[in-house]
Amino acid sequence: MVLFIRQLSGHQGKDTLGRRACGGNAEYPLMDTLTYEISSTAARLVVDEGLEYGPAKRRALKSLGLPARTPLPDNEAVEEAVREHIALFCADTQPGELAALRRLALVWMERLEGFRPHLGGAVWQGTATRLSDIHIQLFCDDPKSAEIALINQQVDYEVRAVNGFNGETVDALSLHARCPELGESVGVHLLVYDHDDLRGALKPDRRGRKPRGDLGAVRALLAEA
């Protein structure tokens, strides 16, 4: 087994990345270097290849020659590593790509305004690049109404079952939309929830951030850019 361990000089004391990935409240004198390597490798795969966090973490284990049962860092640790990777390698291109994806997301949210669309994922959180897909949650009175709307708009889409934000299985209506600013097609995934699910959808995460935003919130992000 080959491990790639970085020399972490000057990292004595508390370290939130290693502490959070282990899931406890203990304070470690040194960064968990193994967790850091997994997070950093996964972040590179997320940014450079467009992988989702789960597949990126599993592939990171293989890349580092680690056993499949090696504890994985949580998504917050990977997100922090993604932000570091973007700051180091994509700082000149990522902001424009993010804005283009948010504008495309806004177009689809406006097209489906009647279904209470909320933008989530990397495009909402600000870590998206041109390889990222757009994830929009719809909160419908009738779960089939969103499909009917797409059919009426003559939109080609595929239906697949995915895990929702509460761990339940929900339908995802997946399609490809042309992004003129990027000059290519982007994956757009419309996750269909019941209207009642909207109550818990806006609960802040552990950092106090909103996990998704409605039309007004997305417009505000674009106005700030």
What are these regions (language model features)?
Residues 135-141:
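Short hydrophobic/aromatic beta-strand micro-patches
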Residues 32-50, 57-130, 141-225:
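Catalytic core of pol beta-like nucleotidyltransferases
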Residues 1-5:
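Short hydrophobic transmembrane-like helices used for membrane targeting/insertion
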Residues 17-18, 140:
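Short, solvent-exposed linear motifs at loop/edge-of-secondary-structure regions
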Residues 8:
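Cationic, low-complexity basic patches in intrinsically disordered or flexible, solvent-exposed regions
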